[in-house]
């Protein structure tokens, strides 16, 4: 009796992702030589960016933030922005490359939200908001 082969549980296939990026990079070079704008990213590459960002947001250090969707959007935006910087000759691991981009995008969003919260708190302190709503017991 033969055993069924266990299917990998990874949500992004690194080899297929690398092949899609190589094809996209070739299209970018051809468009650049022809003087045309950068071609649109394929649905598969976009889906990989979304999966990486979504699954990274489930890590314990990111899961409880109220602005998690904004973090995911920032991560995807940065991946699209820096997709041409990925060099398949240097690295054969696009999953790690884009995970790092998304990770640091998450950290930047957290810092940005903390600054906004500090600004809100300073405005409330200066406006005397607490004094107006303080009750005498």
Identify the role of each PLM range:
Residues 6-8, 28-30, 112, 118, ...:
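Sequence-pattern detector for short linear motifs
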Residues 110, 118-137:
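Charged, low-cysteine interdomain linkers and short loop/connector segments
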Residues 20-27, 78-82, 109:
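Solvent-exposed, amphipathic alpha-helical segments
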Residues 1, 7, 14, 76, ...:
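Alpha-helical interaction segments
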Residues 59-67, 79-101, 112-117:
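Short alpha-helix-to-loop micro-motif enriched in aromatics/charged/Gly
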Residues 1-70, 129-137:
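Extreme N-terminal regulatory/targeting segments of RNA polymerase sigma factors
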